[in-house]
Amino acid sequence: MGLSKEVEDNLPTFSSDVLRLEIHGPDENHLSVIDVPGIFKTTTPGLTSKSDITLVRDMVLNYMRNPRSIILAVVPANVDIATQEIIELARELDPDGMRTLRILTKPDLVDKGAEDKIIELVEGKQESQELGWVVVKNLGQKDLQDLSISRDLEEDLFGHSPPWNRLSSDNYGIEALRTRLQALLAANVRREFPSVSAPSSICSTKSNL
């Protein structure tokens, strides 16, 4: 499927085709990271259409329905979180919350006075979630070039700046997200291993007959 380069060419802005990058090596993890577009409900004249809305939503749902998928539901902290469709879809497709990790971005853009509500959400005081929330600070391209500076910027916001410094270190920053993901991946492997190993045993038995 072709993608639009000009507003007037009438081609779709999004495609169901997948650009795949594979990294092989003895020290590489055996996993797939799938970056999908964000779900949206409103068209942009000359840029997106109703068919784009449907295509993106179907694409996202297709991956979320896979019981082996870990869902990272990313939501900006400076919007009405309760109205974000991705959160509701995650509840529907993963009602136990065992494979959904919710991530809040852009905490530095939250209106003054609204931080307490975000903190209560992350701390689980508003609703109970199995895996909860992690808050991360978005970094500029220049900041990403030096990871030590990136960590310092996060620590400056979450470790020293009220009211964000009320958050537990388990609930903010890239390191907390990395730790949560590692634990989630390990739990996912343990949960799915019986269903993966059973077919392997059957194939092995058949080949020996």
Regions from the language model: what does each represent?
Residues 199-209:
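Core structural elements
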Residues 1-197, 201:
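Globular "head" domains of long coiled-coil molecular machines
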